[in-house]
Amino acid sequence: MSGDEMIFDPTMSKKKKKKKKPFMLDEEGDAQTEETQPLETKEVEPEPTEDKDVEADEEDSRKKDASDDLDDLNFFNQKKKKKKTKKIFDIDEAEEGVKDLKIENDVQEPAEPEDDLDIMLGNKKKKKKNVKFPDEDEILEKDEALEDEDSKKDDGISFSNQTGPAWAGSERDYTYEELLNRVFNIMREKNPDMVAGEKRKFVMKPPQVVRVGTKKTSFVNFTDICKLLHRQPKHLLAFLLAELGTSGSIDGNNQLVIKGRFQQKQIENVLRRYIKEYVTCHTCRSPDTILQKDTRLYFLQCETCHSRCSVASIKTGFQAVTGKRAQLRAKAN
């Protein structure tokens, strides 16, 4: 059937595809092709063909849509990474695991206890220290050093069978320390009241100071302090007036009236200097002393250690001019 003879049929929507037939030879040797053979056009029923074609198209479109969706999902999943779930550390399970590991290590290597310590401390291996054993010479040197330190410590205890000096009965010469110890021992025997290493305190009544008017000060218990110090009032009065740089006198009530304003602290400081210089012994610091005057010098004699030493004479200090200079010059002339 040629192309000119083909008639357009509007009822036909689609034509079936022609099946290709293989090239066949007839018995006569004439080759027949599909074009030479007369083909009868069969009218296709419209209804069944249209339904089949529509269904086929729908299936193809569904498959394409499904494949497109799968591709989109795969692409989306590649972009999104899954979050790793954090494993919760269980202490009980870890302890059980450590115990199991301990048991296995004990069974396999019972002679190495360091592996157990490594497991307990988070697999941290300790460095092995090389233990050095000291020699006998080092031990002897340490013992001698300890003995020297013990001998240096003075605990007041000494063990000796000797009653006399340490050098007695031997040809060796005595040392300075031995002589010094002998001197202190003799002092303790002669003076049992004295205790070596302790300072004797001199206790005295505080001075009573009263303000008299606006320009004078009264030392109330002056005579009582003179009796406690075993000193003459004239000597103490001269020292007080010289140190304070003023003038004063003793009234009828045996009170020292000093010209000027003075506080109790100032008089206490003056009395402390007087006691240190003219009362206490310069050798043993004992207050049991006697002040004697020989020719023009004063001597301090101790009744405890029987020492005798000279003391400085009282000198008047600087005195400021308080009155009018014209009146002083007139009196002098």
From Swiss-Prot:
Keywords: Acetylation, Cytoplasm, Initiation factor, Isopeptide bond, Metal-binding, Phosphoprotein, Protein biosynthesis, Ubl conjugation, Zinc, Zinc-finger
Molecular function as annotated in GO: mRNA binding; translation initiation factor activity; translation initiation factor binding; zinc ion binding
Sites of N-acetylserine modification: 2
Entry protein name: Eukaryotic translation initiation factor 2 subunit 2
Location of the region described as Disordered in the Swiss-Prot/TrEMBL record: 1-120, 139-165
GO cellular component labels: cytosol; eukaryotic translation initiation factor 2 complex; synapse
Annotated Basic residues bias: 13-22
Gene this chain is encoded by: EIF2S2
Higher taxonomy: Eukaryota, Metazoa, Chordata, Craniata, Vertebrata
